[in-house]
């Protein structure tokens, strides 16, 4: 049985969250009555209101109104007054992933999983399906620039979703195609150990039906090892690895644009497809790898080479993924969500490949627990930056951990031999420092999952105000 239209008013607690807002939007577009609440005003809240969805600011029992179903994310605590009221009324309480799973039952579904790269890969798969006239429905974990939103309601038979592994609920998603970009030791607070993370991703792939398939990155050692453990399911591999079924090679850079070739081998038939000089309007091998995953999916869905070329060459990217916020005196300022050492390293490497000048990295560590568990990895992920500025940790509600802070990380990076790493005590100091060290041709890359995105947006105008020069 699929979810009926007659389920009544659906109330989302925390509707402004990036995952919740997309589900709410698609439910609304399907004709369901939707409302919600969030702690504060935000761009997502305003976007939902503009679509006719009522959103309350603040959490109060009376916000439920006539709601017959309540949707919550794992970020919502059991003591939340709306959740308490819903349970007192014996209303069904649905987890975010469970509601996403219900939506997926209406379509053939592609779920994008992995520790990093999910949002960009989801966007790329959506772009290729759209270019192939498949008109997909999309629910993403980030704002897709082409849509101005993280959700899209299509009329086609395919749905593309980002599968969040952080709390294990991605195993509830009924995917026909499961993509795994990489597997790193993240979210150990939920899983307990890395072996449990590995087991979850194996189940994620093996959950696809026999007529479905997995798409797995052969460049990542953990994923390559997992490929050998997958039982009784079809797997398509991709990457730069010469053994990959969908392999990219001959990579060239033109500014912030990537050009590359792809060769696709069908194992059963031995048939080979070659795509020469594909263009992606963003730098970095990690982005080419994500594009390769999308190509693997598109090829299996019989999307033409012409459509694949068009979808990649016109790909508009994702908000906060190496997003240019402005230019000052020949210096380009970028905003990026990267907050894990693997992500930071990949972004800075991509910047290095496309920048003619120096790389100035500004990072706001996110969560004391992450900095503590990955301290040495953080100390070694900034090698492609000529200068590093580290701000205080964005706690995200966590308590401090003794000896784990940005000043300690500055000392560790400096002791490892980096020539220019500094502590940024306040964002008020940022423009002044950048104005003295940045030269024409340099990239300033601001990285983090906290409020550093606001600094990135403001920095070009702040630099202009200091110097009176801009472009």
Swiss-Prot record:
Record's keyword annotation contains Repeat: no
Keywords: ATP-binding, Cell cycle, Cell division, Cell shape, Cell wall biogenesis/degradation, Cytoplasm, Ligase, Nucleotide-binding, Peptidoglycan synthesis
Catalysed reaction, written as an equation: UDP-N-acetyl-alpha-D-muramate + L-alanine + ATP = UDP-N-acetyl-alpha-D-muramoyl-L-alanine + ADP + phosphate + H(+)
Chain positions recorded as ATP binding sites: 114-120
Gene Ontology CC terms: cytoplasm
Enzyme Commission number(s) from the entry: 6.3.2.8
Main location, first listed in the record: cytoplasm
Gene Ontology terms describing biological process: cell division; cell wall organization; peptidoglycan biosynthetic process; regulation of cell shape
HAMAP family referenced in this protein's UniProt entry, alphabetically: MurC
Family, similarity comment: Belongs to the MurCDEF family.
NCBIfam families reported for this sequence: murC (TIGR01082)
Protein name: UDP-N-acetylmuramate--L-alanine ligase
Organism: Allorhizobium ampelinum (strain ATCC BAA-846 / DSM 112012 / S4) (Agrobacterium vitis (strain S4))
